Amino acid sequence: MERRVWFLSRSARSLAAMFSCTYSRATHRHSGKTVVRSSGTRCTRQPRLCRVTRSTLVATSPRRRSLVQQRRPPLREQNGGSGSSCVSSGGSASTVKTPGSRRASK
């Protein structure tokens, strides 16, 4: 019984590794520049996966101005729940774009 459990856990680990590889490839295809880097080195997969997930989260934001809001912590604190609600609701471009332009004009 113990050997079977160990074999199952090992196969599960290999499946998880395969899934992580395919996931990283799929995300790297979206961000074109990192494809060459990821194919070159295979050793540092885990930190790059973290970076890839961060970049995909940023990429899901509708406009680049929301990217600037995420980089600056005081603006994020001023937003409070409004910014997070926009992202969670799917972030229509108009709702995210108008507060950014108002801040830029100020």
Curated annotation (Swiss-Prot):
Biased composition (Low complexity): 84-94
Keywords: Early protein
Species annotation: Human adenovirus C serotype 2
Annotated region described as Disordered, given as residue ranges: 54-106
Superkingdom, taxonomy of origin: Viruses
Cross-referenced Pfam families: DUF5473 (PF17567)
Name of the molecule in the record: Uncharacterized 11.6 kDa early protein
